[in-house]
Amino acid sequence: MVRIGLQLKANLENVTNLKAEGEDFRWYLMLKCMNCGEVTKQWVYMCLMESQPVKGGRGYAHFVSKCKLCHRENSVDIMKDSIHPYLASHNGKFHTIVSFDCRGVEPTDFSPRTGWTAEGENTSTPFEVDLTEKDWSDYDEKAQNAVGVYGVTSQFIKL
């Protein structure tokens, strides 16, 4: 078992509490097989609402697949209690937003996409955030100012 943390870095403008919303949020990852080094050719996703049985009766995981090259079964489990928001106080710094229990694979890339929420820094106005382009902007009517999330980047660390 290897625990991997996904860290996010972004510049938040007049918003805070950027988070993956709900148990149906899809974490899109590229994965590398630790047995043979094969990297997935397409994005794979996992979410808390979906789980699959792990071969050999070892419980369930949020993502289970067989490596196309070496045919080894690998799995990833989202650590539910490790999901945290990215706050305005983290602005411009890497911060761990989720941890994965990886067996046989390790993530190499993350695609943020849709399903994020944030709130106005001074107004708590809720916003639905789409990070497909790694930038998002809107207008907070209550505060009468622009809001946005810019320059989203990510990295993985071993925990």
Swiss-Prot record:
Zn(2+) binds at residues 33, 36, 67, 70. The lineage of its organism: Eukaryota, Metazoa, Cnidaria, Anthozoa, Hexacorallia. GO terms for molecular function: zinc ion binding. It comes from Nematostella vectensis. It comes from the Eukaryota. The keyword DNA damage does not apply. Signal peptide: none annotated. This is UPF0587 protein v1g245604. Keywords: Metal-binding, Zinc. Pfam families: CXXC_Zn-b_euk (PF05907). The keyword Transcription does not apply. Requires a bound zinc ion for normal folding and solubility.
